[in-house]
């Protein structure tokens, strides 16, 4: 069990980034994590027109394999999308999840617990976000992680989104290093958790999108099919493109509209 009192956000290491062209502020903070036994960065984007402390919605966004907390900070589409959301724009926390953690508790570290018990509570306290208005999303590996954490922590999130999420039907199909073995996969089998389970995402709005040339398309189609059969509150999209940065950059404005609207209504 994590000794929460011993886990803290290293505010002394906080760096205040310059205001970007769209008025948002980027703050880089460091979490000294007991869950994964290392220091990790969290990049936090504060929109220009944020709400008062205690009322601010929070989007936790998980990067893909090989990424970091700074993966999306240089993406103009993120800031353009936030500006268009006005007062509904959420604060976005981009935690560093390592190269191939797949955002779940495993032998090399409790990466899911790091997000749930360390990153989210500390960001809530530091930035004054509303603990009842939290969404989680991610791209590729991060999309898998967002679904997994939302399923394992029911009623914690208002909304969850997977953007080209890295999903599989069986443990033997997974990418090298994604899981510790079949037992680890079975504990975090996102597709299996929603199959025939209409309450899997109970109370959450769910988003899924992927490109028509995405190698994960068949798995995402299966996942979406289960959600539709079970009557989930689902927004699902198949767009032109592959599993790459150009595809995701084109759709950041749509992603942010989904999260902002879901957080405003939860």
Model-derived features: positions:
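Secretory targeting and sorting signals
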Residues: 1-14
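Non-catalytic cap/lid and distal C-terminal segments of serine-dependent acyl enzymes
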Residues: 12-266
């Amino acid at each position: 069990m994590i000794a929460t009192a011993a886990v803290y956000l290293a505010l002394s290491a906080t760096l205040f980034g310059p205001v970007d062209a769209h008025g948002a502020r980027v703050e880089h903070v460091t979490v000294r994590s007991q869950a994964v036994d290392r220091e990790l960065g969290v990049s936090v984007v504060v929109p220009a027109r944020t709400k008062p402390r205690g009322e601010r919605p929070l989007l936790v966004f998980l990067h893909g394999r090989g990424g970091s907390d700074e993966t999306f900070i240089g993406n103009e589409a993120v800031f353009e999308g936030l500006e268009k959301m006005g007062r509904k724009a959420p604060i976005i926390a981009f935690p560093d999840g390592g190269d191939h953690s797949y955002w779940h508790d495993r032998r090399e570290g409790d990466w899911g617990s790091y997000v749930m018990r360390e990153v989210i509570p500390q960001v809530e306290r530091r930035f004054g976000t509303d603990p009842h208005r939290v969404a989680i999303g991610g791209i590729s590996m991060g999309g898998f992680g967002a679904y997994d954490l939302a399923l394992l922590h029911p009623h914690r999130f208002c909304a969850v989104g997977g953007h080209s999420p890295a999903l599989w039907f069986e443990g033997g199909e997974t990418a090298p290093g994604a899981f510790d073995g079949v037992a680890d996969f079975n504990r975090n089998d996102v597709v299996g958790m929603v199959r025939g389970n209409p309450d899997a995402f109970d109370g959450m709005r769910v988003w899924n999108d992927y490109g028509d040339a995405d190698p994960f398309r068949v798995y995402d189609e299966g996942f979406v099919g289960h959600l539709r059969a079970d009557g989930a509150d689902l927004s699902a999209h198949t767009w032109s493109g592959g599993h790459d940065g150009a595809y995701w950059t084109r759709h950041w404005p749509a992603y942010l509209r989904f999260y902002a609207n879901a957080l405003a209504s939860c």
